[in-house]
């Protein structure tokens, strides 16, 4: 029988481990749980790409719950859907590396799922904030816009970075890949903004305490700042 240790041994090289450890919540919580969730898929004909497509379902369900069930229970269920996406986002890569069937298109599909999660998660919190918030002076439509912009701020510098890597093709542009060259500030930014990391923890806390507006405004400011600094690094 395949065990968690078997999956970890076949899917986590020393180099990948060093990079993955920089995202603390994803490495110490999300990744071990993704190993457990990978086991049922090992002896099936389900492909990694199919898992990536499957991961879009909880994202859509979570957004639907946020829109249609504007209660604490509905928002907690939505968060569970987003967390399930987080785990499935690890399963597709685990499955690909375990079976040795990684492909360039698999990376594209995985990125598509990740971009969808980034935008939907922050948008959903903007919607949630328009229903339940700690302070009454925010206009609901402001919070919706801030949530949508926050999601866009996370995605936009990544698109510019990938264009720079594929177009400029200098040594400096290639160093933008991965996390190997991350300094302390970049590691902190990664932990605070990676949608598979601490934002999910802060999201749950905000939902439980009714601080959806504080989450939305705070991440609008943080993601905007990180976007500006990231673009400055790419375009210098």
Outline where the language-model segments fall.
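A feature for the membrane-embedded catalytic helix bundles of lipid/isoprenoid biosynthetic enzymes
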Residues: 2-38, 111-236
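Short, contiguous, helix-prone interaction/anchoring segments in small proteins
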Residues: 32-52
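Alpha-helical transmembrane segments of multipass membrane proteins
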Residues: 39-40, 60-67, 201-205
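C-terminal ends of transmembrane helices
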Residues: 39-40, 93-98, 231-232
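A generic hydrophobic-helix recognition signal that picks specific residues
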Residues: 40, 82-85, 103, 147, ...
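Membrane-interface starts of transmembrane alpha-helices
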Residues: 47, 51, 73-74, 106, ...
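Membrane-embedded alpha-helical segments that form the functional core of polytopic membrane enzymes
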Residues: 48-105, 122
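Membrane-interface alpha-helices at helix entry/exit sites of multi-pass transporters
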Residues: 104-112
